[in-house]
Amino acid sequence: MNKYKRIFLVVMDSVGIGEAPDAEQFGDLGSDTIGHIAEHMNGLQMPNMVKLGLGNIREMKGISKVEKPLGYYTKMQEKSTGKDTMTGHWEIMGLYIDTPFQVFPEGFPKELLDELEEKTGRKIIGNKPASGTEILDELGQEQMETGSLIVYTSADSVLQIAAHEEVVPLDELYKICKIARELTLDEKYMVGRVIARPFVGEPGNFTRTPNRHDYALKPFGRTVMNELKDSDYDVIAIGKISDIYDGEGVTESLRTKSNMDGMDKLVDTLNMDFTGLSFLNLVDFDALFGHRRDPQGYGEALQEYDARLPEVFAKLKEDDLLLITADHGNDPIHPGTDHTREYVPLLAYSPSMKEGGQELPLRQTFADIGATVAENFGVKMPEYGTSFLNELKK
């Protein structure tokens, strides 16, 4: 008999809670995503996360300990060697990743692009981090006139190739992206995703078409999600979860436009009758505020998210479990634009916890979440991770 019929897992993308013990190896000494945002805001107002026990993990400005937290609380340390979204999420579901995905804030190495030019017969322009619309405004006309390929990246581990559909036919663009995917399986160039970004229109009025195609990497092994799906449990992926796992172990995928849309979709799944896992990623914290080093925007987004939690609490049933965590840090006060190697918070709450919660031991790997989910549903346990299911008292 499952202890919980439904588990709702929420990943607040990049919401770290202080430097990890190995932060120095990543150039991240002193990083502290929530702590620094709380200082910047002169106190973060997150009363619902505080009720669950956020301040009991660690007190920060505006975030204090409570006598009787509603939930169980601790922090988790990442075991894998990367600090990117895919590594963090894959570890949460029971995998250990010893090859970090690469990010290219200065653009891609010349050797890689030379090889891509040679194999495709087309010149490459761009080669820098940029937003998709800005790069088209800047280079779209040149691409049309020369037949070159616009190659660009973002703060994430991606290589994107844009070309006008009337200049480079879709079939050819897709072939080019497959070549790029092969080249980037090499450890030193390993990107999580290669993306075909076709566009149409005239200079000054370019638009990206729906013919985008992603060439992702599948997880390097079976995850707890695969085990759940194969045992006929529901795995509802909300936001970019399905992309992160390349659809592996997903039974239903709900796309989101924003954090608030993500919270709406979470409420929708709370209203659904299912048995299994609802898995939500809230990406705005990372994409809109962390990489852009915007502590004010980040703080406001955290407060907006917190204000939606009472709606979630009200719909949770006695046999539901809510787990809230993060996948890495992205301290908006830290130098640079990259993620930061930090501990992440873990909060666990069910309305059946009548006595309230208490501190859980520090988790040595994010995979403890996957192990807990697996044990709850009686599916094969992951190779990594220790379940804390029996420590959650009703």
Curated annotation (Swiss-Prot):
The keyword Protein biosynthesis belongs to this UniProt entry's keyword annotation: no
Cofactor-binding details, from the entry: Binds 2 manganese ions.
Record key words, sorted: Cytoplasm, Isomerase, Manganese, Metal-binding
Record-linked InterPro entries: Alkaline_phosphatase_core_sf (IPR017850), DeoB (IPR010045), Metalloenzyme (IPR006124), Phosphopentomutase_DeoB_cap_sf (IPR024052)
Keyword field contains Isomerase: yes
Coiled coil: none
Top-level taxon in the UniProt lineage: Bacteria
EC number: 5.4.2.7
Cofactor(s) listed in the protein's UniProt record: Mn(2+)
Location of the protein in the cell: Cytoplasm
Entry GO terms, CC: cytosol
GO process annotations (BP): 2-deoxyribose 1-phosphate catabolic process; 5-phosphoribose 1-diphosphate biosynthetic process; metabolic compound salvage; nucleotide metabolic process
Reaction(s) this enzyme catalyzes, per UniProt: 2-deoxy-alpha-D-ribose 1-phosphate = 2-deoxy-D-ribose 5-phosphate; alpha-D-ribose 1-phosphate = D-ribose 5-phosphate
Binding annotation for Mn(2+) 1: 13, 327-328
Pathway terms, separated by semicolons: Carbohydrate degradation; 2-deoxy-D-ribose 1-phosphate degradation; D-glyceraldehyde 3-phosphate and acetaldehyde from 2-deoxy-alpha-D-ribose 1-phosphate: step 1/2
Residues where Mn(2+) 2 binds: 286, 291, 339
Principal place of residence: cytoplasm
GO MF annotation, one: magnesium ion binding
Role, per record: Isomerase that catalyzes the conversion of deoxy-ribose 1-phosphate (dRib-1-P) and ribose 1-phosphate (Rib-1-P) to deoxy-ribose 5-phosphate (dRib-5-P) and ribose 5-phosphate (Rib-5-P), respectively.
NCBIfam families with a match to the protein in the record: deoB, PRK05362.1
Family: Belongs to the phosphopentomutase family.
UniProt xrefs under HAMAP family: Phosphopentomut (MF_00740)
Name of this chain's protein: Phosphopentomutase
Source organism (scientific name): Bacillus cereus (strain ATCC 14579 / DSM 31 / CCUG 7414 / JCM 2152 / NBRC 15305 / NCIMB 9373 / NCTC 2599 / NRRL B-3711)
Phylogenetic lineage: Bacteria, Bacillati, Bacillota, Bacilli, Bacillales
